[in-house]
C-alpha cells in the first residue's frame, strides 16, 4: 500500500484547523489512511500516512487528505468544483508512438505560490501515482515542467536513439541510448522502452526537449523550484482513461493550493481531445440497498447528508440516489463502493456490534492442501512461484499468443482495457512476466498455480473457474525435454499416469508440442514456444512451457 509523508502544519493549513495528535489518528481514517509514524525534524512535526486503498490516488497527498477531511467534517459539502480555462497551447502526438507509448495528456497550472511543503508534496504525489497506480511507470508516467521555459506548440514524437539532450541532474548532453545506460532513472526504467524501434520525446516548437517519457525530464525545463509560478504537466501511458485520471489527480491537487487550471488541446492522427476533463461522473444507487447491507436504519436525508460529506452531489428520486462524483475518482464501479463511502462518513466506530446468530466450525479445504503440495513440489524442482492477475485482455490471451480469438468472459464496464476480461489460460500471464523481466539474469524458471475462467452454459453463472498449473522455463539451454522432465516428476509424485500425444497449437513450434492426456482425456498442453510468440513478447531466448488442469490429478 502507498505510504507518503506530510507535515502536520501543512495539513492543518489545508484543512483550516489545528488538531491534536490523537485527533489526527482518527481524522486520517476518513481519507482511508492510517497514521504509520510521527517524527520531528527542524522544529516541524511530520506524519507518515499509510493509504489503505490502491484505487484512490487522489488521497496520496496532503492536498487530497486535507480535502477529504474538510468534507468529512462538514466544512465543505457536495461536489468539489474546479474551473478549467482554455489555453491556446496544442500538443501534437506522433502516430509512430502507437506501439511505443501511445497516449499523452497535458495541462497547465498557473498562479502557483510554492513553498518547500507544497513543492515536496507535488513531487511526492507525482512519484507515488507513477509508482503504484502507474505500476512503476509502465502504465502511467508523469512529468512536471517550468512552463515559462517552454515554447508551444509542443510535440510528443518518436525519436531516433542517437538524438541528444541534457537529462535532469546532468551537465552534458547524452544520446537517448546513453541515458538508458548511464542515468540513474534510465538504468531503473530503461527496460520499458529499450526494445522499441523509437524512443518517445516531448519537445517544444524550438526543438528544446522537455522529457523522454517515461524515463527522465530535461535539465532545461524539468527542474521545478519554489520560484516556479506556472507548470506544464504531461502524463503518458498505454491506457487513455488511466492517464486522464492521473492528470486529474495532479491538477486538482495543485488547485487545492490555489493553482489555476488551463486546458491543452491534444491532436492525434484520428481524433482530438482537450485535457484535463474534470466533468463529474454519474452513478445511481438504491437507498434500500444502502440500508439493507449496512444494517443501519438511515432516513433518505441522512444518506444524502453522508454522501455529500464524501464529495457527492446527490439528488433523491423514487427511492434512489442519483449521484455525481469528482473526476479525480474512478473507483465507483458498484453500489458497494458507494456503501463504503456512506459507512466511512457514518464512522465504523459508531456501528454497534451484534452477536453472530449462526455458529459454525471451519476446516481447511483438502483441495487447497493439494494445491499447496503442488507448489511445494514446484519449488523443490527449482522453480520460482509467481502470482499474476486473473484479469487480462483478449490481446494478451490470443493475439500475442498467436492463436485465433475465442469467446471468453469479458468485463461489462472495465476501468481499463488492459483489465477487460478474465483469463482462460495462465501461460500468457507467465509470458508477460518473462517479457517484463528480460533485463534479469537467465535462466528463469517460473510457475503459477491459479484460476482460469471458462464459459460453461450448463451452470447458473454460465462460467466455471478451474485451478491450473502453468510452468515456463526461459533460457538458451532449454528444450521440450526439460519441460517434460518436470511434468514427469510431478506426475510420478502424484501417482498419476499420463501420456503425451502430438498436436498442433499456434503458441508452440510445430512438431514440438503435445497435449497431455490422463485416462485418455486431455488435461493440458506442453511444448516449445513459437518464435512469433517470443517476438510478440520481446523475449530473445527460447521458452518451453506446459499448462495443466489440476482437478483431474486430484485423488482425495
Swiss-Prot record:
Major localisation: cytoplasm
Swiss-Prot/TrEMBL cofactor(s): Mg(2+)
Sites where the protein binds Mg(2+): 331, 337, 340-341
PROSITE patterns listed in its UniProt record: B5
Top-level taxon in the UniProt lineage: Archaea
Boundaries of every B5 domain copy: 278-353
Subcellular location: Cytoplasm
This protein's record includes keyword Magnesium: yes
Enzyme Commission numbers on file: 6.1.1.20
Keyword Ubl conjugation: no
One Pfam family linked to the record: B3_4
Ranges that cross the membrane: none
Molecular functions per Gene Ontology: ATP binding; magnesium ion binding; phenylalanine-tRNA ligase activity; RNA binding
Family statement: Belongs to the phenylalanyl-tRNA synthetase beta subunit family. Type 2 subfamily.
Record protein name field: Phenylalanine--tRNA ligase beta subunit
Species whose genome carries this gene: Pyrococcus abyssi (strain GE5 / Orsay)
